[in-house]
């Protein structure tokens, strides 16, 4: 079994001191910095872009940066995030006109590529790209806003994807995002996830280590 990775979502951080807050959460045990990138088009919210990614790199953040694109179109912004220092770039297949080409674009720019599945998105998008992706991210809430409750049906979907990954024999991370808390993370891990995005559950605590 792979090492579990915790990916604090900076959407819940204090943006007035983002560099310091990000460094503190990594020092407390975070493994990966998670970016929720929203365009007020694919999802009804507007958040951050490549400039913030570059600023964190310039601040001295060396941990992997995991960019979750909730934007449409996807391809236009991929090179910008790669240049800004992204490590992983994941996108929603519904937001790309050509899923395979977008995966290739991400890889050509030196990043690991991921596909993101909303709660009601079928897994059939994986049928022809399992040999090309590095991350599968399952949304356990509907995308657009932080602080939502975990959708319990995601556990069955996690089990399905875990089997697909194991059967493929490939080194693919299984990430989950939405409503991950101290009281449900063990159950989520048991269903097959090995990378956990958490925002308010981490940044909302006085001591990030907890």
Swiss-Prot record:
Pathway(s) per entry: Carbohydrate degradation
Enzyme active site: 36, 177
Statement: the UniProt record of this protein carries the keyword Magnesium: no
HAMAP family linked to this entry: RPE
PROSITE patterns, per the entry: RIBUL_P_3_EPIMER_1 (PS01085), RIBUL_P_3_EPIMER_2 (PS01086)
Cofactor(s) the protein needs: a divalent metal cation
Protein's UniProt name: Ribulose-phosphate 3-epimerase
EC number: 5.1.3.1
Catalytic reactions on record: D-ribulose 5-phosphate = D-xylulose 5-phosphate
Cofactor comment: Binds 1 divalent metal cation per subunit.
Binding, a divalent metal cation: 34, 36, 68, 177
Presence of the UniProt keyword Metal-binding in the record: yes
Domain of life: Bacteria
Keywords attached to this entry: Carbohydrate metabolism, Isomerase, Metal-binding
UniProt function note: Catalyzes the reversible epimerization of D-ribulose 5-phosphate to D-xylulose 5-phosphate.
Family: Belongs to the ribulose-phosphate 3-epimerase family.
């Amino acid at each position: 079994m792979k090492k579990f990775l915790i990916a604090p979502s900076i959407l819940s951080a204090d943006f007035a001191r983002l560099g310091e807050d990000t460094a503190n959460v990594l020092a407390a045990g975070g493994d990966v910095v998670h970016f929720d990138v929203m365009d007020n088009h694919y999802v009804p919210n507007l958040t951050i872009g490549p400039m913030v990614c570059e600023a964190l790199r310039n601040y001295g953040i060396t941990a992997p940066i995991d960019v979750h694109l909730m934007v449409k179109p996807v391809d236009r912004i991929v090179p910008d995030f790669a240049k800004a220092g992204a490590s992983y770039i994941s996108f929603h297949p519904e937001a790309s006109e050509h899923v395979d080409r977008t995966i290739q674009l991400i890889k050509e720019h030196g990043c690991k590529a991921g596909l993101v599945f909303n709660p009601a998105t079928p897994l059939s998008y994986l049928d022809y790209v399992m040999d090309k992706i590095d991350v599968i991210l399952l949304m356990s809430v509907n995308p657009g806003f932080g602080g939502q409750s975990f959708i319990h049906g995601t556990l069955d979907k996690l089990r399905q994807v875990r089997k697909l990954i194991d059967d493929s024999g490939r080194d693919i991370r299984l990430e989950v995002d939405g409503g991950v808390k101290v009281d449900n993370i063990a159950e989520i891990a048991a269903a097959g996830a090995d990378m956990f995005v958490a925002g308010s559950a981490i940044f909302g605590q006085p001591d990030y280590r907890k």
